[in-house]
């Protein structure tokens, strides 16, 4: 029999076919239309198995093609570069935590369960919320789950979402609610301030079918929403649930969502000790205020404290009848092990920072991002499209097409911001962007603009 270079067990095919009562591979796959079958060997890699040395050589050749940047990337859009203390990496790399095992058996999982409980407690304190679950996939999935949760609770079908919320999160929501009959209605934002347009909010909320109202703080443009408490009041008046999406890191500067009585809070823990890795893995945050009608409809897992038969305190998964332990169609979600390891990373990071460290870090980011915006707008004909206060991310409008600027930055081994329109880009500046890096970005852009305008 022909020996396939990748599959060592081809000589067992006849034996396996005989065992299942099938005469040939063609018969086994006869439900697949012939016109879409490939009846040839695929041209995979080098066409043969490689030795360990050859594999290592091949990988090293590819690694050499990577471009080493002169400065940390200036692109964010909700996923931003930060310094991660080595102790975070060390602790989550321990075998007790570095596992995909779900702690169904509390008698052998006390360490993992306690670590997740500590995450929940720290995040609850940071958000000023009562109940936090043990993690979600990311901000987008947490928001989608919040929308579905609101629909389960009140049965209404319309959710108001700001135009200035993260567009990637909105795409996730639209995907998740497909087939559910839930409608997303977008609320405009003020083109001068970048904040939510309250007049349009009043207009769009003037119906009885509002299930929830969502607002992001800071919004996608990095701008603080100064009227967020008014949005919460509108939701209460319409008997809808309020959903607040918040960057947890920004809470070193602004009021937490629990202080203005948000019903549901979502976010992402990426900026609390998680690296950049082609956009993942991320760590969704999900919290609610103390109301059992909310708690029992929460997605994901919740770790709680109980006592064993001897009266000794212990940790265990609680309210499990909400989750995948019951019939799938009755479960609030089926999110399984999700991002437990990254929740522990968040807990370690927050423990290391403490309250004062969090305040110092957010202030440092605030001042560095404002310094960068100031230096960029000192370039002739460069401006900020929005006049409101911002944190970490900010939009810049250029007199020439941003694609030209972006290409020049790449030539200089700099990663610019996210393109918002032909002439506008969203930049991100954090504690890892020192003055030298920011000044290099500014001088490169200034050189590019001056060169175009004088040519």
Swiss-Prot record:
EC number: 1.4.4.2
Electron transport as UniProt keyword: no
Catalyzed chemical reaction(s): N(6)-[(R)-lipoyl]-L-lysyl-[glycine-cleavage complex H protein] + glycine + H(+) = N(6)-[(R)-S(8)-aminomethyldihydrolipoyl]-L-lysyl-[glycine-cleavage complex H protein] + CO2
SUPFAM superfamilies in the record: PLP-dependent transferases (SSF53383)
Keyword Cell membrane: no
Listed GO MF terms: glycine dehydrogenase (decarboxylating) activity
Gene Ontology biological process terms from the UniProt entry: glycine decarboxylation via glycine cleavage system; nucleoside metabolic process
Keywords attached to this entry: Oxidoreductase
Signal peptide: none
Pfam assignment, any one: GDC-P
InterPro entries the record matches: GcvPA (IPR023010), GDC-P_N (IPR049315), GDC_P (IPR020581), PyrdxlP-dep_Trfase (IPR015424), PyrdxlP-dep_Trfase_major (IPR015421), PyrdxlP-dep_Trfase_small (IPR015422)
Disulfide bonding pattern of the chain: none
Similarity comment: Belongs to the GcvP family. N-terminal subunit subfamily.
Function, as annotated: The glycine cleavage system catalyzes the degradation of glycine. The P protein binds the alpha-amino group of glycine through its pyridoxal phosphate cofactor; CO(2) is released and the remaining methylamine moiety is then transferred to the lipoamide cofactor of the H protein.
Subunit structure: The glycine cleavage system is composed of four proteins: P, T, L and H. In this organism, the P 'protein' is a heterodimer of two subunits.
NCBIfam families xref list: PRK00451.1
Name of the protein in its database record: Probable glycine dehydrogenase (decarboxylating) subunit 1
Biological classification of the source: Archaea, Thermoproteota, Thermoprotei, Sulfolobales, Sulfolobaceae
């Amino acid at each position: 029999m022909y020996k396939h270079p990748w599959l060592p067990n081809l000589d067992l095919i006849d034996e396996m076919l005989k065992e299942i009562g099938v005469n040939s591979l063609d018969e086994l796959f006869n439900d697949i239309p012939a016109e879409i079958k490939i009846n040839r060997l695929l041209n995979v890699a080098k066409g043969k198995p490689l030795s360990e040395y050859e594999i290592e050589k091949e990988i090293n050749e590819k690694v050499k093609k990577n471009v080493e940047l002169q400065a940390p990337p200036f692109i964010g859009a909700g996923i931003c570069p930060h310094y991660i203390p080595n102790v975070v990496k060390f602790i989550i790399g321990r075998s007790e935590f570095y596992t995909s095992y779900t702690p169904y058996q509390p008698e052998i999982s006390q360490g993992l369960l306690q670590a997740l409980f500590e995450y929940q407690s720290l995040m609850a304190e940071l958000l000023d919320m009562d109940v936090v679950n043990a993690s979600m996939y990311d901000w987008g999935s947490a928001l989608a789950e919040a929308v579905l949760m609101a629909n389960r609770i009140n049965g209404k079908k319309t959710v108001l979402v700001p135009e200035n919320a993260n567009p990637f999160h909105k795409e996730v929501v639209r995907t998740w609610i497909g087939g559910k009959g839930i409608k997303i209605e977008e609320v405009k934002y003020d083109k001068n301030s970048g904040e939510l347009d309250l007049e349009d909010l009043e207009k769009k909320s003037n119906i009885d079918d509002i299930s929830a109202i969502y607002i992001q703080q800071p919004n996608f443009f990095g701008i603080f929403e100064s009227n967020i408490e008014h949005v919460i009041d509108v939701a209460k008046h319409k008997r809808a649930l309020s959903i607040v999406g918040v960057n947890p890191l920004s809470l070193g500067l602004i009021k937490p969502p629990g202080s203005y009585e948000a019903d549901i809070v979502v976010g992402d823990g990426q900026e609390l000790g998680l690296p950049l890795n082609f956009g993942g893995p991320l760590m969704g945050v999900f919290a609610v205020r103390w109301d059992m009608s909310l708690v029992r409809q929460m997605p994901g897992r919740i770790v709680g404290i109980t006592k064993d038969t001897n009266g000794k305190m212990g940790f265990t998964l609680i309210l499990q009848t909400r989750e995948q332990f019951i019939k799938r169609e009755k479960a609030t979600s089926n999110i399984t092990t999700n991002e437990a390891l990254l929740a522990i990373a968040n807990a370690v990071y927050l423990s290391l920072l403490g309250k004062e460290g969090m305040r110092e870090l957010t202030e440092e980011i605030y001042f560095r991002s404002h310094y960068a915006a100031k230096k960029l707008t000192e370039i002739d004909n460069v401006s900020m499209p929005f006049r409101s206060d911002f944190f970490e991310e900010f939009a810049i409008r250029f007199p020439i097409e941003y694609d030209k600027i972006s290409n020049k930055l790449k030539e200089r081994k700099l990663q610019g911001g996210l393109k918002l329109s032909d002439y506008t880009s969203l930049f991100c500046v954090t504690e890892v962007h020192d003055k030298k890096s920011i000044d290099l970005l500014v001088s490169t852009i200034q050189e590019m603009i001056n060169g175009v305008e004088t040519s």
